[in-house]
Amino acid sequence: MRNKLFLVASLLIIASMVLGACAAPAPEKVVETVTVETVKTVEVQVGGETVVVTATPEPVKAKEFKSPDPTTYVQVVFGDPDTFDVAFDYENAGLGVLLLTYDTLIFYNKEDPNDFVPQLATEVPGLENGGISADGLTFTFKIRQGVKFHDGSDLTPEDVAFTFQRGMLQGGYDSPQWLLTEPLLGVGISDVGELVGDGSAAGDREALPGMDPAELVRVCELVKSKVVADNDNWTVTFQLAQPWAPFLPTLAQGWGSIQSKAWVTASGGWDGDCATWQNFYDPGSEALNALPLGSTTMGTGPYTLERWVPGEEIVLKANENYWRTEPAWEGGPTGAPKIKTIIIKNVTEFSTRYAMLQAGDADSINVGSTADWPQMDVITGQICHNTDEDCEPSEKPDEPLELIRDYPTANRTDIFLNFAINTEGGNNFIGSGQLDGNGVPSNFFTNIHVRKAFAYCFNYDAYLEQVLLGEGVRSPTVILPGMIGYQEDAPMYNYDPAKCEEEIKQAEFDGASVWDMGFRLTLGYNTGNDQRQTIGQILQTELSALNENFVVEVTGLPWPTYLRNFRASKLPLSTSGWIEDIDDPHNWVQPYAIGNFARRQNLPEDVTAQFKSIVDRGAVEVDPAKRAEIYYEFNQIYYDQVPTIILYLVNGRRYEQRWVQGWFNNRVLPGTFYYSMWKE
């Protein structure tokens, strides 16, 4: 090619010489520009003339983004897991690790939260293959043979059945076990303790072991009858209490991770004896983490847990003997992971996380707040829509990050009000504990006027513009858009300082006026979550502007400490979030009205009874139109009672180095599924 270019250039020069010899001489210098296919500009003096031959510019070579270490992935987050016990962990930091170190019977078909592929089961049960009975009450799973746990022991059907039996019997209202007890033991049964005697010992780890031994054995045997292993035929059968449409989705999450019975027993867990299960009931994460059961993992998954140093890092190593030989979906991974080491670093300050990402020392980070998006955009060179396969350059195409945006999420952050603040052992979050200007009484939020005032005093528009940067959608209901029961025109509270003042002036405690006395309390959030911090600060600003004696102190707590105080009902009000476990409205109304959040908020019995009737009816109703009407009733009562200040929904954003490949979004999947990913 170079010889050809030289020949063309030479002919052009000769032609110019001939023309120059024939033409009359001119006093001025004539410049003729000829663009040819060459590699540089050449100036040639011929007969007093300069002939400039200009090369066609070569295209600028695109900047390459290559990782200095494609075998190691560094994710920088804020906050630790609560525990690694699969039966108890119920938060994203832990669940994301569990789904990498363990396997479930079935798993999501990549992005789809309602379509499933076999994992430790050899097929997904259905009516067509006989895995689901005609009445919808019996689910039979064929268990995969030849799978080994990380310690080299063999997976058996007995391990599978034991995993679910142990989970339900260990129970605990702070655990995810309600997702299994409802379909297997009966709608509305949120904890196995409710079946023991009159149910009064449910949630009480001290009282339940003292219940009648025969009654305890009866409940244990009932639970065991609901999940039965057949080691000869390599099957496990679940017997449901009533048809339950979202049963398969329930098994695909982290609490469906299959454990070794032998390892659990050796690591401080229950051994399967119905005479002793009560001694392991609702232990709490602190007790579990003092044992290998909660501080380590031992599953069949694509990664093994090398170490967890709380407050510092989690390190995962590839399972080089991972059993998968066929991809779960088209183009999916098989065998050992491509990324050999995953390091999840715990760094509270966003500025430090950002600097690590900018320097290339991190592959991705948890941002912490939508308000930090503009700073992230400064170092973003490529913008992708929904997936990493639909991308275009940004205004700064040489920058190192890739932004994946506009993908749907199934989570929300709201403000939860505590009706009966726990003062046992003292409680600094409510100051003096009295309505004296230096605190609040423990029943502060039982007053409907106080709750409505707080809802009216929150500046929703400021939150949308300053924190969500205009990208949020106001949600009038806890049920998500597109679900049965969502109402776009449902009533909701809006920012109205006049109504806030009107309501708070009606609030009294023992004849003392809240407006006259003032108050002081603490709003808690998990440290590093700047979005939740700002929510608190907005409420703080608006209330103090209304009355300088209204003091809301916004306090950050490390994630495990925050969880413990939230679960113990110590916090008078909290900013917290929920990501759905299964894509169904029941998974929203249950925790918000009678489940996890409602218990932490100590909703009064008459209110929870009213909600429970609606929630239980909605769970079993099969007619979509009738089910929607039930949830419309729920929406109105939730608005009237205002136990929670409902905020906005936001589409997702993920920032990562441009050498990262293979990430996908499944809106119910916690954490990052590194097994499908690789680095260039």
Residue ranges and their predicted role:
Residues 1-9:
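Bacterial N-terminal signal peptides that target proteins for export
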Residues 4-5, 14, 22-25, 30, ...:
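Extracytoplasmic/periplasmic ligand-capture domains
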Residues 10-18:
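Bacterial N-terminal signal peptides
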Residues 74-132, 298:
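N-terminal lobe/hinge region of extracytoplasmic solute-binding protein
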Residues 222-229, 241, 245, 257-261, ...:
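Glycine-rich (often Gly-Gly/Gly-Pro-rich) flexible segments and glycine-rich loop motifs
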Residues 260, 268-283, 656-680:
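A C-terminal, polar beta->alpha supersecondary segment
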Residues 647:
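Active-site-proximal polar cores
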